[in-house]
Amino acid sequence: MGQTQRSSQQSKPRAAAAPKRETKATSPARPDLAKQPTLYVVGYAHLDTEWRWEYPQVISEYLTKTMRNNFALFEKYPHYIFNFTGANRYRLMKEYYPADFERLKFYVSTGRWFPAGSSMEEGDVNSPNAESIIRQILYGNNWFRKEFGMASDEYMLPDCFGFPASLPSILAHAGIKGFSTQKLSSAWQPAPHVGGPDSPEKTPVGIPFNVGIWEGTDGRTVIAALNPLSYGSNVQYDISKAAPPPPGPDPSLSEQQNQQRTRRQEDWPQRVQINGNLTGVFADYHYVGTGDVGGSPNESSVKLMEAITTK
Protein backbone atom coordinates (compact mmCIF):
# COMPACT_ATOMS: atom_id res chain seq x y z
CA MET A 1 0.00 0.00 0.00
CA GLY A 2 2.76 2.42 0.92
CA GLN A 3 1.88 5.51 2.91
CA THR A 4 -1.58 5.84 1.39
CA GLN A 5 -3.39 9.00 2.40
CA ARG A 6 -6.76 8.13 0.88
CA SER A 7 -8.35 4.75 0.24
CA SER A 8 -10.71 3.87 -2.58
CA GLN A 9 -13.58 3.70 -0.10
CA GLN A 10 -13.35 7.24 1.22
CA SER A 11 -16.25 9.50 0.32
CA LYS A 12 -18.15 12.58 1.38
CA PRO A 13 -19.77 12.38 4.84
CA ARG A 14 -23.13 10.64 4.80
CA ALA A 15 -25.76 9.79 7.35
CA ALA A 16 -25.27 6.63 9.34
CA ALA A 17 -27.39 3.71 8.20
CA ALA A 18 -28.57 0.79 10.28
CA PRO A 19 -26.09 -2.10 10.00
CA LYS A 20 -27.16 -5.45 8.67
CA ARG A 21 -27.61 -7.99 11.42
CA GLU A 22 -25.66 -10.72 9.65
CA THR A 23 -22.28 -8.98 9.98
CA LYS A 24 -20.95 -10.83 13.01
CA ALA A 25 -17.37 -11.94 12.49
CA THR A 26 -16.55 -15.61 12.45
CA SER A 27 -14.48 -16.59 15.52
CA PRO A 28 -12.24 -19.52 14.56
CA ALA A 29 -10.79 -21.80 17.18
CA ARG A 30 -7.52 -20.52 18.58
CA PRO A 31 -4.60 -22.16 16.75
CA ASP A 32 -1.95 -24.21 18.53
CA LEU A 33 1.01 -21.94 17.72
CA ALA A 34 3.48 -24.69 18.62
CA LYS A 35 2.16 -26.73 15.69
CA GLN A 36 0.04 -24.56 13.40
CA PRO A 37 1.83 -21.74 11.49
CA THR A 38 -0.23 -18.57 11.94
CA LEU A 39 0.04 -15.02 10.62
CA TYR A 40 -1.99 -12.37 12.45
CA VAL A 41 -2.99 -9.67 9.96
CA VAL A 42 -3.99 -6.50 11.83
CA GLY A 43 -6.29 -4.14 9.96
CA TYR A 44 -5.50 -0.65 11.25
CA ALA A 45 -5.66 3.07 10.47
CA HIS A 46 -3.11 5.38 12.04
CA LEU A 47 -4.30 8.83 13.05
CA ASP A 48 -2.12 11.63 14.36
CA THR A 49 -4.70 13.50 16.41
CA GLU A 50 -2.47 16.57 16.20
CA TRP A 51 0.32 17.01 13.66
CA ARG A 52 0.30 19.04 10.45
CA TRP A 53 -3.38 19.97 10.55
CA GLU A 54 -5.76 21.78 12.83
CA TYR A 55 -7.72 19.89 15.47
CA PRO A 56 -11.16 20.67 13.94
CA GLN A 57 -10.13 18.83 10.76
CA VAL A 58 -9.55 15.66 12.79
CA ILE A 59 -13.12 15.91 14.07
CA SER A 60 -14.84 16.96 10.84
CA GLU A 61 -12.96 14.74 8.38
CA TYR A 62 -10.55 12.15 9.74
CA LEU A 63 -12.77 10.60 12.41
CA THR A 64 -15.83 10.44 10.16
CA LYS A 65 -13.99 8.71 7.33
CA THR A 66 -12.43 6.26 9.78
CA MET A 67 -15.88 5.20 10.93
CA ARG A 68 -17.74 5.27 7.62
CA ASN A 69 -15.05 3.71 5.44
CA ASN A 70 -14.85 0.75 7.78
CA PHE A 71 -18.63 0.47 8.11
CA ALA A 72 -18.79 0.01 4.33
CA LEU A 73 -16.09 -2.68 4.41
CA PHE A 74 -17.83 -4.55 7.24
CA GLU A 75 -20.98 -4.85 5.13
CA LYS A 76 -19.11 -6.26 2.12
CA TYR A 77 -16.50 -8.53 3.76
CA PRO A 78 -17.80 -10.65 6.66
CA HIS A 79 -14.35 -11.73 7.91
CA TYR A 80 -12.86 -8.23 8.02
CA ILE A 81 -11.86 -6.92 11.48
CA PHE A 82 -10.59 -3.40 12.16
CA ASN A 83 -8.45 -2.06 15.02
CA PHE A 84 -8.37 1.56 16.17
CA THR A 85 -6.62 3.09 19.17
CA GLY A 86 -7.12 6.06 21.46
CA ALA A 87 -10.05 6.41 23.85
CA ASN A 88 -9.83 10.16 23.35
CA ARG A 89 -10.70 9.73 19.65
CA TYR A 90 -13.67 7.53 20.56
CA ARG A 91 -14.78 10.23 23.01
CA LEU A 92 -14.82 12.74 20.15
CA MET A 93 -16.73 10.31 17.93
CA LYS A 94 -19.39 9.93 20.60
CA GLU A 95 -19.65 13.68 21.22
CA TYR A 96 -19.81 14.87 17.60
CA TYR A 97 -21.30 11.86 15.76
CA PRO A 98 -23.59 10.02 18.19
CA ALA A 99 -25.46 8.08 15.48
CA ASP A 100 -22.23 6.81 13.93
CA PHE A 101 -20.90 5.99 17.38
CA GLU A 102 -23.93 3.83 18.14
CA ARG A 103 -23.28 1.94 14.92
CA LEU A 104 -19.62 1.57 15.89
CA LYS A 105 -20.70 0.09 19.23
CA PHE A 106 -22.72 -2.52 17.36
CA TYR A 107 -19.63 -3.57 15.41
CA VAL A 108 -17.60 -3.72 18.63
CA SER A 109 -20.25 -5.99 20.16
CA THR A 110 -20.09 -8.35 17.17
CA GLY A 111 -16.29 -8.55 17.10
CA ARG A 112 -15.78 -6.57 13.90
CA TRP A 113 -14.25 -3.39 15.38
CA PHE A 114 -11.67 -3.73 18.16
CA PRO A 115 -10.88 -0.80 20.52
CA ALA A 116 -7.12 -1.32 20.60
CA GLY A 117 -4.10 0.08 22.38
CA SER A 118 -5.36 0.37 25.98
CA SER A 119 -4.63 4.11 26.13
CA MET A 120 -6.15 7.57 25.71
CA GLU A 121 -3.71 8.37 22.87
CA GLU A 122 -0.71 6.78 21.15
CA GLY A 123 1.59 8.92 23.27
CA ASP A 124 5.34 9.23 23.70
CA VAL A 125 6.84 6.92 26.34
CA ASN A 126 10.35 8.41 26.60
CA SER A 127 9.69 11.72 28.38
CA PRO A 128 6.70 10.77 30.58
CA ASN A 129 7.36 8.99 33.85
CA ALA A 130 5.95 5.59 34.73
CA GLU A 131 2.89 7.05 36.45
CA SER A 132 1.93 8.97 33.29
CA ILE A 133 2.06 5.80 31.19
CA ILE A 134 0.07 3.87 33.78
CA ARG A 135 -2.57 6.62 33.81
CA GLN A 136 -2.80 6.46 30.02
CA ILE A 137 -3.74 2.80 30.42
CA LEU A 138 -5.98 3.36 33.45
CA TYR A 139 -8.04 6.12 31.83
CA GLY A 140 -8.03 4.57 28.36
CA ASN A 141 -9.20 1.12 29.38
CA ASN A 142 -11.68 2.53 31.91
CA TRP A 143 -13.29 4.48 29.07
CA PHE A 144 -13.41 1.34 26.91
CA ARG A 145 -15.00 -0.64 29.75
CA LYS A 146 -17.61 2.03 30.35
CA GLU A 147 -18.63 2.42 26.69
CA PHE A 148 -18.01 -1.04 25.24
CA GLY A 149 -18.00 -3.38 28.22
CA MET A 150 -14.49 -4.54 27.36
CA ALA A 151 -10.86 -3.46 27.59
CA SER A 152 -7.69 -4.05 25.61
CA ASP A 153 -4.69 -5.94 26.98
CA GLU A 154 -2.10 -4.75 24.45
CA TYR A 155 -0.21 -1.49 23.96
CA MET A 156 0.03 -0.33 20.35
CA LEU A 157 2.57 2.40 19.48
CA PRO A 158 3.27 2.07 15.75
CA ASP A 159 4.53 5.63 15.29
CA CYS A 160 6.49 6.56 18.43
CA PHE A 161 10.24 7.11 18.30
CA GLY A 162 12.01 5.10 20.96
CA PHE A 163 11.00 2.91 23.89
CA PRO A 164 12.69 2.75 27.31
CA ALA A 165 14.00 -0.47 28.78
CA SER A 166 11.50 -0.05 31.61
CA LEU A 167 8.46 -0.13 29.31
CA PRO A 168 7.78 -3.91 29.50
CA SER A 169 7.84 -3.69 33.30
CA ILE A 170 5.47 -0.71 33.36
CA LEU A 171 3.06 -2.37 30.92
CA ALA A 172 3.10 -5.71 32.74
CA HIS A 173 2.37 -4.05 36.10
CA ALA A 174 -0.60 -2.32 34.42
CA GLY A 175 -2.02 -5.66 33.24
CA ILE A 176 -0.85 -5.36 29.63
CA LYS A 177 0.22 -8.56 27.88
CA GLY A 178 1.30 -7.43 24.39
CA PHE A 179 3.11 -4.61 22.59
CA SER A 180 3.68 -3.69 18.94
CA THR A 181 5.50 -1.03 16.92
CA GLN A 182 6.90 -0.47 13.42
CA LYS A 183 9.49 2.12 14.50
CA LEU A 184 12.59 0.15 15.49
CA SER A 185 14.33 -0.28 12.14
CA SER A 186 17.19 1.87 10.86
CA ALA A 187 14.76 3.28 8.29
CA TRP A 188 13.39 5.49 11.08
CA GLN A 189 16.23 6.12 13.53
CA PRO A 190 19.79 5.10 14.44
CA ALA A 191 19.47 1.43 15.24
CA PRO A 192 21.24 -0.69 17.85
CA HIS A 193 23.58 -3.39 16.63
CA VAL A 194 21.05 -6.21 16.66
CA GLY A 195 19.30 -8.14 13.94
CA GLY A 196 20.41 -7.95 10.35
CA PRO A 197 20.30 -10.43 7.45
CA ASP A 198 23.04 -12.59 8.99
CA SER A 199 21.34 -12.89 12.38
CA PRO A 200 19.46 -16.09 13.30
CA GLU A 201 16.21 -14.09 13.23
CA LYS A 202 16.89 -12.66 9.71
CA THR A 203 15.39 -9.35 10.81
CA PRO A 204 16.28 -5.85 9.55
CA VAL A 205 19.16 -4.14 11.34
CA GLY A 206 17.95 -2.73 14.65
CA ILE A 207 15.20 -5.28 15.26
CA PRO A 208 16.13 -8.12 17.65
CA PHE A 209 13.20 -10.36 16.72
CA ASN A 210 9.90 -10.31 14.85
CA VAL A 211 7.70 -11.71 17.62
CA GLY A 212 9.11 -12.63 21.01
CA ILE A 213 9.35 -11.92 24.73
CA TRP A 214 10.54 -8.46 25.78
CA GLU A 215 11.86 -8.40 29.35
CA GLY A 216 11.84 -5.23 31.43
CA THR A 217 14.21 -4.00 34.08
CA ASP A 218 12.55 -5.96 36.89
CA GLY A 219 12.13 -9.19 34.94
CA ARG A 220 8.48 -8.60 34.00
CA THR A 221 7.70 -9.35 30.35
CA VAL A 222 5.30 -8.66 27.49
CA ILE A 223 4.87 -10.38 24.14
CA ALA A 224 6.27 -7.94 21.57
CA ALA A 225 5.76 -7.71 17.80
CA LEU A 226 8.66 -5.55 16.61
CA ASN A 227 8.60 -5.97 12.83
CA PRO A 228 4.99 -5.91 11.56
CA LEU A 229 5.95 -3.76 8.55
CA SER A 230 4.49 -0.31 7.94
CA TYR A 231 0.94 0.46 9.04
CA GLY A 232 0.51 1.68 5.46
CA SER A 233 1.14 -1.79 3.99
CA ASN A 234 -1.07 -3.33 1.33
CA VAL A 235 -1.85 -6.96 0.63
CA GLN A 236 -0.92 -7.42 -3.02
CA TYR A 237 -0.54 -11.19 -3.32
CA ASP A 238 -1.46 -14.37 -1.45
CA ILE A 239 0.60 -13.83 1.71
CA SER A 240 -0.01 -17.41 2.81
CA LYS A 241 2.56 -18.25 0.14
CA ALA A 242 6.06 -17.00 -0.68
CA ALA A 243 6.29 -13.54 -2.24
CA PRO A 244 6.17 -13.73 -6.06
CA PRO A 245 9.36 -12.96 -8.00
CA PRO A 246 9.62 -9.69 -9.94
CA PRO A 247 8.62 -9.79 -13.61
CA GLY A 248 11.23 -10.12 -16.30
CA PRO A 249 14.39 -12.23 -16.75
CA ASP A 250 16.84 -9.64 -15.35
CA PRO A 251 18.42 -11.22 -12.22
CA SER A 252 19.39 -7.77 -10.93
CA LEU A 253 15.67 -7.09 -10.41
CA SER A 254 15.50 -9.98 -7.96
CA GLU A 255 18.50 -8.63 -6.06
CA GLN A 256 17.01 -5.13 -5.88
CA GLN A 257 13.67 -6.53 -4.73
CA ASN A 258 15.32 -8.49 -1.93
CA GLN A 259 17.16 -5.35 -0.77
CA GLN A 260 13.93 -3.31 -0.64
CA ARG A 261 11.66 -5.95 0.85
CA THR A 262 12.10 -5.11 4.54
CA ARG A 263 9.25 -2.57 4.82
CA ARG A 264 6.78 -3.37 2.07
CA GLN A 265 6.89 -7.05 1.13
CA GLU A 266 7.89 -10.19 2.96
CA ASP A 267 8.01 -13.95 2.60
CA TRP A 268 5.60 -14.45 5.49
CA PRO A 269 5.62 -18.28 5.53
CA GLN A 270 9.41 -18.17 5.83
CA ARG A 271 9.23 -15.60 8.63
CA VAL A 272 6.75 -17.74 10.56
CA GLN A 273 8.94 -20.82 10.08
CA ILE A 274 12.11 -19.04 11.25
CA ASN A 275 10.36 -17.71 14.33
CA GLY A 276 9.00 -21.16 15.13
CA ASN A 277 12.40 -22.80 14.75
CA LEU A 278 13.96 -20.25 17.12
CA THR A 279 11.24 -19.89 19.74
CA GLY A 280 8.82 -22.78 19.31
CA VAL A 281 6.06 -20.30 18.40
CA PHE A 282 5.11 -20.49 14.73
CA ALA A 283 3.48 -17.08 14.45
CA ASP A 284 4.03 -13.57 13.13
CA TYR A 285 2.26 -10.21 13.08
CA HIS A 286 1.50 -7.93 10.10
CA TYR A 287 0.03 -4.42 10.05
CA VAL A 288 -2.19 -3.69 7.03
CA GLY A 289 -3.79 -0.28 6.76
CA THR A 290 -3.23 3.41 6.26
CA GLY A 291 -1.98 6.62 7.88
CA ASP A 292 -1.57 9.29 9.07
CA VAL A 293 -5.07 10.73 8.74
CA GLY A 294 -7.24 7.77 9.69
CA GLY A 295 -9.44 5.89 7.25
CA SER A 296 -9.22 2.17 6.55
CA PRO A 297 -7.13 -0.40 4.71
CA ASN A 298 -7.80 -0.11 1.00
CA GLU A 299 -10.57 -2.29 -0.36
CA SER A 300 -8.31 -4.32 -2.64
CA SER A 301 -6.33 -5.51 0.40
CA VAL A 302 -9.47 -6.38 2.34
CA LYS A 303 -10.95 -8.19 -0.65
CA LEU A 304 -7.79 -10.24 -1.16
CA MET A 305 -7.56 -11.11 2.53
CA GLU A 306 -11.20 -12.22 2.47
CA ALA A 307 -10.34 -14.57 -0.40
CA ILE A 308 -7.22 -15.88 1.36
CA THR A 309 -8.98 -16.58 4.66
CA THR A 310 -11.96 -18.32 3.05
CA LYS A 311 -10.22 -20.41 0.40
Where are these regions (language model features)?
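Catalytic-domain carbohydrate-binding cleft regions of carbohydrate-active enzymes
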Residues: 4-311
